[in-house]
Regions:
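Glycine/threonine-rich flexible loop motifs
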Residues: 110-112, 247-253, 281
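Active-site catalytic loop in hydrolytic enzyme cores
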Residues: 122, 128, 132, 149-235, ...
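Short beta-strand scaffold segments in enzyme catalytic cores
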Residues: 143-145, 161-165, 206-207, 289-291, ...
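Active-site beta-strand/loop signature of hydrolases that rely on acidic residues for catalysis
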Residues: 66-69, 80, 88-118, 134, ...
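N-terminal chloroplast transit peptides
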Residues: 1-34
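A short, hydrophobic beta-strand-centered structural micro-motif
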Residues: 123-151, 266, 270-274
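Short beta-strand segments enriched in small/hydrophobic residues
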Residues: 59-72
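C-terminal beta-strand edge segments of enzyme domains
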Residues: 2-6, 58, 271-344
Length: 344
């Protein structure tokens, strides 16, 4: 079977465009499975987005554009902010309404002690700098995993892995604290004990309305638990976010598979901004940030280095797909217990 392929540009920090590729579902296969479903036209170039003022009546230019940023964070918080800000400004210049940053966008420390030392409260200088950046650029920011000193810091001396969503005015509109902590031992990758420095969040966050659609917040290891994504989808999410820092062993084996599975089972767009490359002598990340559509097709991706990729979110396509494949109407919660029930 031959997939229709269209070209799209990805952008590196050197500002020299690199030609990448995105795939769309086979037109004939989709038409056969879902008669009447409007499918993306094959072999249509994904050109550089026009400024909003120049947009014409063509539907493709009316779809919201999102940017997925990929970075290599280090313990140097100031340099990390400079790198992220450069990508966010580039995303704004290209017309994105929302930019996604990965888990640990603020820093990647060498050990738990350094993690605790570098952490800040939500109202600290770093988040303040990003609120100013959001206002300056006029776009929403998904800050994928901030090392947050919570209100219980003095008692616990532990932090939260906090996903912060800022609107274009720089206001914090939602926070989600990672509920599934990554305490694992992967052969060839070494042990990881996130709980040495981090507390699990107490609850999920209801999906948030944004210019791109209703977003459900999650972080990295959360993607391994489909109950979370199903709960967010049943609560109205149209876009699921998994900002991450996947390792070099689990990345090639599981990264794309898990993201596509979450998209297919929830019929949501999935946006996954990722860390990449070597952060320091003790840690490296897989990269390959991507956007997956509700059919499970990767519609945009970065490679291994720092940069960004762009995707348009087509909610009418999402709604048509849900109409033709109404899986949520066919669910049997009477058999599953509380598994995947909507958020209260």
């Amino acid at each position: 079977m031959v997939l229709a392929v269209s070209s799209c540009r990805t952008y590196s920090l050197s500002r020299r465009p690199r030609l990448g590729f995105i795939t769309r579902p086979p037109h004939q296969l989709l038409s056969f499975l879902c008669p009447g479903l409007r499918t993306p036209r094959p072999s249509v170039p994904c050109a550089l987005p026009r400024p909003r003022a120049m947009a014409n009546s063509s539907s493709s230019w009316e779809l919201p554009l999102v940017a997925v940023c990929q970075v290599t964070s280090t313990p140097d918080k100031q340099q990390n902010f400079k790198t992220c800000a450069e990508l966010v400004r580039e995303a704004a210049r290209l017309g994105a309404c929302l930019a996604f940053l990965p888990e640990a966008f603020d820093f990647v420390a060498r050990d738990p002690a350094e993690t605790l030392r570098l952490s800040e409260p939500l109202g600290g200088d770093l988040v303040g700098a990003y609120t100013q950046l959001a206002r300056e650029c006029g776009l929403w920011l998904s800050l994928g995993g901030f090392h947050e000193r919570g209100q219980d810091w003095e008692q616990t001396q532990k932090i939260y892995n906090c996903h912060v969503l800022l609107n274009s005015k720089g206001s914090v509109v939602a926070t989600y604290r990672k509920t599934h902590l990554c305490d694992v031992e992967i052969p060839g990758q070494g042990p990881m004990r996130e709980s040495n420095s981090t507390l699990p969040g107490p609850s999920l966050e209801s999906p948030v309305s944004t210019p791109a659609g209703k977003i459900g917040l999650a972080i990295c290891y959360d993607m391994r638990f489909p109950e979370l994504s199903l709960a967010l989808a049943q609560a109205g999410a149209e876009i699921l976010t998994y900002p991450s820092a996947f390792g070099s062993v689990t990345g090639p084996a599981h990264w794309e598979v898990l993201l596509r599975a979450r998209a297919i089972e929830t019929q949501c767009y999935v946006v996954a901004a990722a860390q990449c490359g070597r952060h320091h002598e003790k840690r490296a990340s897989y990269g390959h940030s991507m956007v997956v559509d509700p059919w499970g097709t990767v519609v945009a991706r970065c490679s291994e280095g720092p940069g960004l990729c762009l995707a348009r979110i087509d909610l009418s396509y999402l709604r048509q797909l849900r109409q033709h494949l109404p899986v949520f109407q066919h669910r049997r919660p009477d058999l599953y217990g509380n598994l995947g029930h909507p958020l209260s």
